[in-house]
Amino acid sequence: MKRAETQIDQLANQLVKDQAAAYPSFATSIGYPGGEGDMDDYSPEALAQEQTDIKAVIAKLEALTPADDIDMVTKEAMLFTLRGEIETYDSGLAFRSLNNIASAAQGVRGVFDISPTATVTDWENLASRMHKVGDSLRGYARSLEEGAKRNDAPAPRQISEVIAQVDQINTADGFFHTFALNFYRCKCDVF
């Protein structure tokens, strides 16, 4: 017998939809349709809006009573994760999130690794996404600048490591050059 969808299930499902709409790279990573030609917004304004949205979800979630054990686990897991996001933001980490493994610096490039490339439409989406990289990185830079204004900047070693990564990505045989060649080859084969 199929379990009936509860209010907590509905809220959880809506959260995934909202996160996919707000973060195109998340949507791509989970195979959720929409935003294939867009990039994430890492600006201070987007970070602040995310906090407002998370607080609204927490308030709704806290008002709901679990219908069963599954709901109880869902509610607790969501609250744990969402409260952690609030704590991360309040700590200022969102404004110094730069490192050599997993930060927006890698995410902006990494989304291209997981984006579909099988069709003409896929490549059109990738071209659109590529054109939005600059805006995404400018928003990210503004967030890092906000952290620096608060005297809360990334560690110098992390900064130098990310600079080295960016330098490598932008070489003649780096990611974006190779990506553009693949686009050209695909264009010749399928257009």
Where in this protein do the model-derived segments appear?
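N-terminal maturation segment of proteins
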Residues: M1-F191
